[in-house]
C-alpha cells in the first residue's frame, strides 16, 4: 500500500513538474503581456472599441491597431478584481498559410514541449493545440494555437491565444460578489433618466 501511495505521489509530482518545467510559462505575444495594465499598451490598441466579452460581462475587450505581421487581434482585461490588467491575448497572424502554422508549432514545441491537448476536429479541417502552464507565481496560463482554412464557424487562417485562467476566474468571482450586493444590483438597473425641472443655470450653479 505504501509503495502504491509513493508511486502515485511520484507520478503526480512528475505530471505537475511536466506542466511547470517543460518550458518557462509564456506571458507575452507580440508586444502584449499578460497581467500588465492595458494602459501600458495604449499606443497599440483602440480603447474606444472596448466592449464586454460575451457571457463574461466583467471582462472587456479592445481591438488592436495595425501591427506588422498581424491581421487582427483582441486584448481582454479585467474590470473588477484587478481593473485594467490583461487576462487574455488573441491574435490572428497575417500569414494564413499552413507552412507558417507548422513552423510556428515546431518552434513552440521546441520551447514549451508537446501540447497537452488537441482541440481541433478529427478530420483536421480545424487544427488546434492547447498547452497548460503554471508559472512561478502560481498563475495558470493556457496557450492555444490553431490553423483553419475551411471551417466558417471558426477564425480563418492562423490564430493564437494566451490566457491567464486564474485572473479571469478571480475577476468573475469579484463581479459575482458585487452583483450579490443589493446596492450593486440597484446600480446596475436600467433606471429612467430623471429631469430635475430646473433651468441649466440653476441646475449647474450652487445657490
Segments predicted by a language model, with ranges:
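Bacterial N-terminal signal peptides that target proteins for export
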Residues: 1-7
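Mid-chain, structured segments of secreted extracytoplasmic proteins
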Residues: 63-107
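General secondary-structure edge motif
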Residues: 9, 21, 87-89
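Bacterial N-terminal signal peptides
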Residues: 8-17
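Non-cytosolic coordination micro-motifs
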Residues: 23-61, 91-207
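Sterically constrained small-residue positions within well-ordered secondary structures
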Residues: 13, 69, 80-82, 120-122, ...
Amino acid at each position: 500500500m505504501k509503495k502504491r501511495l509513493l508511486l502515485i505521489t511520484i507520478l503526480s509530482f512528475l505530471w505537475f513538474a511536466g506542466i511547470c518545467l517543460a518550458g518557462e510559462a509564456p506571458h507575452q505575444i507580440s508586444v502584449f503581456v499578460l497581467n500588465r495594465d492595458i494602459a501600458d499598451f495604449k499606443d497599440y490598441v483602440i480603447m474606444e472599441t472596448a466592449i464586454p466579452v460575451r457571457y463574461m460581462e466583467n471582462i472587456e475587450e479592445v481591438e488592436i491597431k495595425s501591427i506588422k505581421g498581424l491581421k487582427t487581434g483582441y486584448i481582454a482585461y479585467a474590470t473588477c478584481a484587478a481593473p485594467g490588467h490583461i487576462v487574455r491575448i488573441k491574435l490572428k497572424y497575417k500569414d494564413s498559410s499552413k507552412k507558417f502554422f507548422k513552423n510556428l508549432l515546431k518552434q513552440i514545441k521546441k520551447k514549451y514541449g508537446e501540447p497537452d491537448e488537441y482541440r481541433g476536429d478529427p478530420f483536421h479541417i480545424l487544427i488546434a493545440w492547447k498547452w497548460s502552464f503554471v508559472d512561478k507565481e502560481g498563475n495558470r496560463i493556457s496557450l492555444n494555437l490553431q490553423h483553419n482554412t475551411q471551417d466558417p464557424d471558426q477564425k480563418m487562417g492562423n490564430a493564437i491565444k494566451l490566457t491567464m485562467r486564474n485572473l479571469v476566474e478571480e475577476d468573475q468571482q469579484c463581479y459575482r460578489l458585487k452583483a450579490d450586493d443589493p446596492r450593486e444590483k440597484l446600480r446596475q438597473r436600467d433606471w429612467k433618466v430623471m429631469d430635475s425641472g430646473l433651468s441649466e443655470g440653476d441646475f449647474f450653479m450652487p445657490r
